[in-house]
């Protein structure tokens, strides 16, 4: 069954420009407060100019182009400009340093890079000292003299015609993007995403939050992340809505931005909710038009209730990962919600809980969350040049092993427990890091928390807690361990405590646990 009607991304943008014309498609706000607005017609023209720019630089169908950018209009131009000529976008996490960025360049086979002045010095070093196929760099925010290896993106783009000059045959099965996973526990893998994947993601995510063309979807999630691309941008564009892309998240500025742009949909991660809650209460806290807040794991019930009560919002839970493209389990429009459930399987998907022998488990039994989709259509196609890793998680019949532990109830609601790799084995007992973190997060002095397992010669693993305190607070070990003993089983109480100023997180707010072990 072809849900997207055989339409690739080039056809999508040509149709959107025809249908929505002068309606606002994209608003970008920089950290300095500069705002750029584009109608659907104007945005399609900018995308065409960018596609023509890449063509003049020798980019052809199947070539890989890396983007190392913060949230900005140019990211959107490049993403869809590359897709229009059949080239492949390779977004690089803007927080990565030289070694990790070099690794992605080399393993993606990118031959051209689009970046900004902020990151350019690092890539000068990479070009000079590291082996890669990179032959050209475009800088989005610098006027440059002619140079064999570097060009001004803006100058070149503005010289291009607004109609597409190169339009090779495209298929919805063509690769549109290679998105490298966050690599919180190991080297990132290149997730291959097709035109079909992105088109489907737009329709699916628009369905999930009942998006209309009069909606305004605001996000502060990084554009190089799957959530921003598939849950927000593709959903907004597919519905003919307005997409607001804010360069960087600021707890102090967030509600003002929601109000200014009259946003009706936004998305949040736990880090955002916790930092918003420590802002001083304001009479404007409920002065917004938000209908839904798309939410991704994990939050305690106490934190959820406090946030919803203060800001007058409700959370629409969505569970997924880069490999699933969208939130394949989640709350549904018009359906009941059952916190702390992550929801039920969405349309076009099946979900099961399986044991260690890959056998389905009944309701109430703990096991691995497994999802069935269609590779290259409703879930990722494969890991780039890594068939062994692909075979490890993706079965031939489309069942994807998520590596997450959970269970389901009799009505088909699923419950996330933890990443399997985050389960601590302590003296014969399995302890969920997330469970402990949700309990410890309710301590009034604690702003942020993560627990990890560390080697223990007697009990397999001991539990260590890393906490960040609220400003001006102090916390003794005695007070901390007493709190834990009163709120969790004895075998779950951490053995060690370390108080830190911050915790290492990736772009989507996930703790980088390998940096703490």
Curated annotation (Swiss-Prot):
UniProt enzyme class: ligase
Pfam families: AMP-binding, AMP-binding_C
GO molecular function: carnitine-CoA ligase activity; crotonobetaine-CoA ligase activity; medium-chain fatty acid-CoA ligase activity
Catalytic activity: 4-(trimethylamino)butanoate + ATP + CoA = 4-(trimethylamino)butanoyl-CoA + AMP + diphosphate; crotonobetaine + ATP + CoA = crotonobetainyl-CoA + AMP + diphosphate; (R)-carnitine + ATP + CoA = (R)-carnitinyl-CoA + AMP + diphosphate
Annotated S-S bridges: none
UniProt superkingdom: Bacteria
InterPro entries recorded: AMP-bd_C (IPR025110), AMP-bd_C_sf (IPR045851), AMP-binding_CS (IPR020845), AMP-dep_synth/lig_dom (IPR000873), ANL_N_sf (IPR042099), CaiC (IPR023456)
Gene Ontology process terms (BP): carnitine metabolic process; fatty acid metabolic process
Alphabetically ordered keywords of this record: Ligase
Entry EC no(s): 6.2.1.48
Its biological purpose: Catalyzes the transfer of CoA to carnitine, generating the initial carnitinyl-CoA needed for the CaiB reaction cycle. Also has activity toward crotonobetaine and gamma-butyrobetaine.
HAMAP family assigned to the protein according to its UniProt record, in alphabetical order: CaiC
Similarity comment: Belongs to the ATP-dependent AMP-binding enzyme family.
Name of the protein: Crotonobetaine/carnitine--CoA ligase
Organism name: Escherichia coli O1:K1 / APEC
Lineage: Bacteria, Pseudomonadati, Pseudomonadota, Gammaproteobacteria, Enterobacterales
Gene label: caiC
């Amino acid at each position: 069954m072809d849900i997207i009607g055989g339409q690739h991304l080039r056809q999508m943008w040509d149709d959107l420009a025809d249908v929505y014309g002068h309606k606002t498609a994209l608003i970008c706000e920089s950290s300095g407060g500069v705002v750029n607005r584009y109608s659907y017609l104007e945005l399609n023209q900018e995308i065409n100019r960018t596609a023509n720019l890449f063509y003049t630089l020798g980019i052809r169908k199947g070539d890989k182009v890396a983007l190392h950018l913060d949230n900005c209009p140019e990211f959107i131009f490049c993403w869809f400009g590359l897709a229009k000529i059949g080239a492949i976008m390779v977004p690089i996490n803007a927080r990565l340093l030289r070694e990790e960025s070099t690794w992605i360049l080399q393993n993606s086979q990118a031959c051209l890079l689009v970046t900004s002045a902020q990151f350019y010095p690092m890539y000068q070093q990479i070009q000079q000292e590291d082996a890669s196929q990179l032959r050209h760099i475009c800088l989005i925010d610098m006027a440059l003299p002619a140079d064999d290896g570097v060009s001004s993106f803006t100058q070149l783009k503005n010289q291009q015609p607004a109609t597409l000059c190169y339009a090779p045959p495209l298929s919805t099965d063509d690769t549109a993007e290679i998105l490298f996973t966050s690599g919180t526990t190991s080297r990132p893998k290149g997730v291959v995403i097709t035109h079909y994947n992105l088109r489907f993601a737009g329709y699916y995510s628009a369905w999930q939050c009942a998006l209309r063309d009069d909606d305004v979807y605001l996000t502060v999630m990084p554009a190089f992340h799957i959530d921003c691309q598939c849950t927000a941008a593709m959903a907004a564009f597919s519905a003919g809505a307005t997409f607001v892309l804010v360069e960087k998240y600021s707890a102090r500025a967030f509600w003002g931005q929601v109000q200014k742009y009259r946003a009706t949909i936004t998305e949040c991660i736990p880090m955002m909710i916790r930092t918003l809650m420590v802002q001083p209460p304001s009479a404007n806290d409920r002065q917004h038009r938000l209908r839904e807040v798309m939410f991704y794991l994990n939050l305690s019930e106490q934190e959820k209730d406090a946030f919803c009560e203060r800001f007058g919002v409700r959370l629409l839970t969505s569970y997924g990962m880069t490999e699933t493209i969208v939130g394949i389990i989640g709350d549904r429009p018009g359906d009941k919600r059952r916190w702390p459930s992550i929801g039920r399987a969405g349309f076009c998907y099946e979900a099961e809980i399986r044991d260690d022998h890959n056998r389905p488990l009944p309701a109430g039994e703990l096991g691995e969350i497994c999802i069935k989709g269609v590779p290259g259509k409703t879930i990722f196609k494969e890991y780039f040049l890594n068939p062994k890793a692909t075979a490890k998680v993706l079965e031939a019949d489309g069942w994807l092993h998520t590596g997450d532990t959970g269970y389901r109830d009799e009505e088909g609601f699923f419950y996330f427990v933890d990443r399997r790799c985050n389960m601590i084995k302590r003296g014969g007992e399995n302890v969920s890091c997330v469970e402990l973190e949700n309990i410890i997060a309710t301590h009034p002095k604690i702003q942020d928390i993560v627990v990890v397992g560390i080697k223990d010669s007697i009990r397999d693993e001991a539990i260590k807690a890393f906490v960040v305190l609220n400003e001006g607070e102090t916390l003794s070990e005695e007070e901390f361990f007493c709190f834990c003993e009163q709120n969790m089983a004895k075998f779950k109480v951490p053995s060690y405590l370390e108080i830190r100023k911050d915790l290492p997180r990736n772009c989507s707010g996930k703790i980088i646990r390998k940096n703490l072990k």
